[in-house]
Design a protein with these regions (language model features):
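Intrinsically disordered, low-complexity Ser/Thr/Pro/Gly-rich regulatory segments
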Residues: 1-246
Length: 246
């Protein structure tokens, strides 16, 4: 498992604990693939798990009346993050992603595509404090685009429309390490039920010897991965041998 896998699984676990169904998505092409979406997610407005005795993460701004569709990009590093050019500027890629949800008509998709290209413009995102959002007329759907910055912290960058590493880590900690025993949701069960994707992360948070949630570097160390190499990431983000345009 590499660092990108850990980042994406951490975010996926965070969404799952907030009531979202989550999957990844490959946008296919005649040769190779056009692009990859780190997470597509949907949450329904009547989701409820009262036995867990925990509120939803406020950073996600969930809705009690809307079906919430998310398109998410997870990016490491300390600089501004954006959706890949191969998604945000490609009409066919955007169309493919919307079709994957299976919730939008062809007419709705044709209306949404140019709006999505507009709201995902990096300059617009940089100047905003809110997640790019489109309401679907005549429905109770909203379509949102979340940028996830696991190597950054809200304390120093809280004005940007991102989900930060400490947002995810602190919330997951509260879910797995409640301060008071819950009547209908025990903490002792077969953790392997979380499956291969999540089990090692779950064990990190449930480790009885761990007294605090730590940070993203603590998680990297647990997975025997090197801490963030800021100098290298800066070079990549400035365009030197970057594997994906941003």
């Amino acid at each position: 498992m590499n660092k990108s896998d850990v980042q994406e699984n951490l975010f996926s676990l965070y969404l799952r604990l907030n009531g979202y169904f989550v999957t990844g998505f490959i946008v296919h092409a005649d040769q190779g693939n056009k692009t990859e979406i780190d997470a597509l997610a949907v949450r329904f407005p009547h989701h409820c798990e009262p036995e867990r005795e925990i509120d939803l993460s406020p950073e996600l701004d969930t809705s009690g009346s809307l079906v919430d569709f998310l398109v998410c990009e997870v990016k490491g590093g300390k600089k501004n993050v954006n959706f890949n050019v191969s998604f945000r500027e490609d009409t066919e890629a955007i169309t493919s992603v919307l079709r994957r949800f299976g919730a939008f008509t062809n007419e709705e998709i044709s209306i949404l595509v140019p709006k999505i290209r507009d709201v995902l413009c990096p300059d617009r995102i940089r100047q905003s404090r809110e997640y790019p959002t489109l309401d679907i007329l005549g429905t109770n759907y909203r379509l949102r685009f979340l940028l996830v910055a696991p190597d950054q912290k809200r304390g120093t960058n809280g004005h940007k429309p991102y989900i930060y590493g400490d947002d995810m880590i602190s919330y997951i900690w509260k879910c797995f390490r409640p301060e008071v025993q819950r009547q209908s949701c025990g903490v002792r069960y077969n953790w392997n039920l979380w499956g291969d994707q999540y089990i090692k992360l779950v064990k990190y948070f449930k480790d009885k010897n761990r007294k605090a949630p730590g940070d993203i570097d603590s998680i990297y160390a647990y997975f025997d991965l090197p801490a963030l190499d800021t100098a290298m990431l800066n070079r990549l983000e400035d365009g030197d041998s970057a594997p994906h345009p941003i």
